[in-house]
C-alpha cells in the first residue's frame, strides 16, 4: 500500500513538473536591454538616436547614434560604469574580432528591408539581396552557403536511388547522418523540435531564440555559425503582419549581443532563401499521375512507378522513375495547372518544359560558361535579357556567357539567377538526383498529407520565383554589394574560421 501511495505521489509530482515546464517553456526571451526612446536628433524626420536601458531601472544608460545619416549606427555611448564613447562605424581596420554568422531561415528580403525602414536592425547596414540556390530549400541552400559536401536529398526525407527506398526524415536532423552542413553549424535547432514547429510554432520560435542566446553566450569560439530554423516555420503558418511582429524579437536579441560586445564584433545576418507570403494548397499529384498511367509508390517497382518524397509543404518536388520515362514525365508534369516548369538532364543538356514552351541550358567546360536557348516559346521569360546581353557583348559567338554575367543579368528577374540556379540545381547539390525536378507556381505546394491537414499554409518556398529565391544579408559594417549569390557570402568567414 505504501509503495502504491509513493508511486502515485511521484506520478502526480512528475505530471505537475511536466505541466509547469510546458507552461513556461517557449515563453518570450527575457531580454536585458530595453529601448527607452527613439529620437530624431537633428530634426530631419529620420530616427538617428536610440536610447537604451540595460539596468532595468527605466533610465537610459546606453545610446546608439547614427551620426552620418546612412541609417546604420556608427557611435555607441555607454554610461556605466564610466561614460565611454565607442566608434562602431567599422570603417577603420580593426584587430581580430569575434565573428558571428546568423542564418534566419526563410526570411524574405522584402520583410527584413521593411523592418529596417521602420527603424529596426539599425546596428546593420540596410539589407541587401541574397540570391538562393534552386530548389530554394534549406538543405540545398545551406549546403551551398556553407560550402559543404552534398546532402543525400533535397529535403530531410529523400529517395535513396541505390537502395530503392524512401530514407531519412526527421531522424536525419537528430542524428546528423549524412548531412554535412550540420557539422559546420555551431548552433542549430535540435531536430526533434523542427516537426513540432507546425503544431506550436510560436513556442518553438521563442525556445529557439532562447537556446541560441544561451549557447552563444557559453561559447568561446572566435567564429560562430548559427542557424535559427524556426523563423521559417512561423513564416509558413502566420500572416505577414504577425511574422513581422515576431521578427522584432530577433532585433532585440541581436542588439543585446551587439551591446554585450560593445559593438566590437563582426556580425553577418542572412537568410538561406525567401518565402512567398501567398496562401497555398497541396496538389493531388497521386491522382493526376494515376489518371495518366503512372502510380505513386515508395519504391520503383515497375515501369509505371513514380516516387516523390512527401515531407515539407514546399513549392518544388523531385520526381524519380525509370530513366526511359523522364521526357514523358517532364512533359506530363509541365501540363499540370500547378506547374511553373519542369527540368531534367538529357545527355549534356538540361531540358526545360512548361506551358509557355521549352528551352535548353548547356554548359561549356566545367560549367563556368552557360547557354540558354529557347526551343519554342520562352519558358523562363528571358528573351529581353538575352537581347540586352547580346547588345552588351556578354554572349560569345555560340551564345555562351560566364556565370558572373548570367548572375548580373538575371538576379533581379522574376526567375532569379535562373540559368545558373537551374544548372546547379539539376547537376549538383545532392547525391540522389531526381530524374525530373518540378517548380510549382506560387499558391501551390506538395508534401506530407499529415502536415497539410494540420496547418493552413500562408507561405512557402522551393520554387524559382523571385520571392522564394531572394533572401537577405546585412553586416554591422559598410557593405558594397546590393545583391550577391549565396555561394559568395561566407567564403572569407570560413577561411578565417578554419585558420
Give the ranges of each region predicted by the language model.
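Active-site-proximal N-terminal segment of extracellular/periplasmic enzymes that hydrolyze or transfer
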Residues: 81-129
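Acidic, His- and aromatic-enriched active-site or binding-groove loops in soluble protein domains
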Residues: 89, 152-159, 245-255, 285-302
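Active-site metal-binding loops of divalent metal-dependent hydrolases
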Residues: 106, 271-274, 442
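Active-site neighborhoods of enzymes that stabilize oxyanions during catalysis
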Residues: 306-490
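Metal-dependent active-site segment of extracytoplasmic phospho-/sulfohydrolases and closely related
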Residues: 101, 253-285
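Calcium-binding acidic motifs and repeat modules
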Residues: 7-98, 438
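Short secondary-structure boundary/capping segments
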Residues: 93-94, 115-120, 239-244, 280-290, ...
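His/Asp/Glu-rich, glycine-adjacent segments
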Residues: 116-120, 133-249, 363, 368-415, ...
